[in-house]
A protein has these predicted regions:
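Long, low-complexity intrinsically disordered regions
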Residues: 1-168
Length: 168
């Protein structure tokens, strides 16, 4: 993880997953839209009051504060966002950071004093492969069934968070 070959991200569901850095782009393209929808629903239901303008502003601020290989903890990022005038209690910060992950702005950085950090994905993994959707779905299914067999199609759908129609 320190070197960035393995990343910790919300990649298949709104749950932390460890993935190979070279897989991040195609996996994000498969799952980002659903994770953002779940994230938005949760934010709305919990009164976070976030909109697309907030997410865009946060992403721009993250690009500035994490640029140049700067890896910061959540607490440090919260402080920087607050200094820039954004309200960032824990629920809002969770939603903002998950959205930035699914937009491909941030990913896990190198731990600092035993605490996880965030870094810019473009700096941490500048050359990640992207795949057409059909190829990405086939690769995801192949990897799942090789590592989780015996397993059923329903197991794969649950694990991946994919809609049944897309998983077929």
């Amino acid at each position: 993880m320190r070197e960035g070959r393995i990343l910790r991200m919300h990649i298949m569901r709104p749950t932390w997953h460890f993935i190979a850095a070279e897989d991040v782009r195609w996996m994000l393209h498969l799952s980002a839209r659903r994770i953002r929808a779940a994230n938005a629903s949760f934010a709305k239901g919990n009164g976070c009051g976030l909109d697309e303008g907030d997410y865009l502003r946060c992403s721009r601020l993250l690009e500035r504060i994490l640029g140049g290989g700067n890896h910061l903890t959540r607490q440090q990022i919260a402080g920087e966002l607050e200094r820039a005038g954004m309200a960032v209690d824990a629920p809002r910060l969770n939603r903002l950071m998950m959205h930035a992950e699914t937009d491909g702005v941030v990913c896990s950085g190198a731990d600092r004093a035993g605490k996880p950090t965030y870094a810019l994905l473009a700096e941490r993994v500048p050359q990640a492969v992207d795949l057409p959707e059909e190829e990405a779905l086939a690769l995801l299914a192949l990897r799942y069934f090789r590592s989780h067999s015996p397993a059923t199609f329903d197991d794969f759908v649950w694990w991946s968070g994919l809609p049944v129609g897309q998983a077929r």
